[in-house]
Amino acid sequence: MGVQHLLKLRMASPHPHPHPGAPLAARPLSALASFFLARPSSTAAAPPPRHVTLSCSRPHCNHNQWAASRCRGTAGRRRLQVVVAMSSSAPPPPPGSVQKSEEEWEAILSPEQFRILRLKGTEYPGTGEYDKLFAEGVYECAGCGTPLYKSSTKFNSGCGWPAFYEGFPGAIARTPDPDGRRIEITCAACGGHLGHVFKGEGFNTPTDERHCVNSISLKFIPASEDSKL
């Protein structure tokens, strides 16, 4: 059937607005013209975009975890960096971190060190090696090597024992004597006896404290050999 014949039939039709499902002969003139005269597109229409769900091949991850932490790899690396950064400035040993039996201490300490550090003895005033020493350096525990005092905190108290106005943070433990008259100071790491601390004596120091320490309880490390200053 030719186009002209269809057009004639359409013009003679009594129904100007047929149903969309009507045959071609019953459709409007504009629809017929579009049907026969429209050129086919040279390029097919692009398919609608599909929704893509990201997933991870690692069995322990779902796509939400992948999007949030890239299979936890990024978060794990960050945690590792934090741990490394924290370890670069290590705090002093925690209290009681050096544990030895009294027999072990007796084997590694000299008799005088054992008497003072472990049996809480006291050396005679004015006889200690470090009483009059004011060189720059660090004083460590003679028992376990924990840094206790900077030389910059040492002062001349005239008492006959080395005197310091403060120790390294967390390095010194304080325990009141049973009679309550004095406060004993010990190495926080190994419990070695250092001496006693007194406050309010009027010394011109930042803390108005005097750590009265036995020289035998200490080991001096000169500044040229120490990196903790």
From Swiss-Prot:
Annotated transit peptide: 1-71
Cofactor: Zn(2+)
GO process annotations (BP): cellular response to oxidative stress; protein repair
Residues of the MsrB domain: 102-223
Keywords annotated in UniProt: Chloroplast, Disulfide bond, Electron transport, Metal-binding, Oxidoreductase, Plastid, Redox-active center, Transit peptide, Transport, Zinc
Family matches, as SUPFAM superfamilies: Mss4-like (SSF51316)
Cystine residue pairs: C159-C212
Catalytic reaction annotation: L-methionyl-[protein] + [thioredoxin]-disulfide + H2O = L-methionyl-(R)-S-oxide-[protein] + [thioredoxin]-dithiol
Residues holding Zn(2+): C141, C144, C187, C190
This enzyme's EC code(s): 1.8.4.12
Chief location bin: plastid
UniProt superkingdom: Eukaryota
GO cellular component, one term: chloroplast
GO molecular function, one term: peptide-methionine (R)-S-oxide reductase activity
Enzyme class (EC, first level): oxidoreductase
Details of cofactor binding: Binds 1 zinc ion per subunit.
Listed InterPro entries: Met_Sox_Rdtase_MsrB, Met_Sox_Rdtase_MsrB_dom, Mss4-like_sf
Catalytic center residues: C212 (nucleophile)
Localisation: Plastid, Chloroplast
NCBIfam families documented for this protein: peptide-methionine (R)-S-oxide reductase MsrB
Its job: Catalyzes the reduction of methionine sulfoxide (MetSO) to methionine in proteins. Plays a protective role against oxidative stress by restoring activity to proteins that have been inactivated by methionine oxidation. MSRB family specifically reduces the MetSO R-enantiomer.
Similarity remark: Belongs to the MsrB Met sulfoxide reductase family.
PANTHER family linked to this entry: PEPTIDE METHIONINE SULFOXIDE REDUCTASE 2
Name this polypeptide is given: Peptide methionine sulfoxide reductase B3, chloroplastic
Organism: Oryza sativa subsp. japonica (Rice)
Lineage: Eukaryota, Viridiplantae, Streptophyta, Embryophyta, Tracheophyta
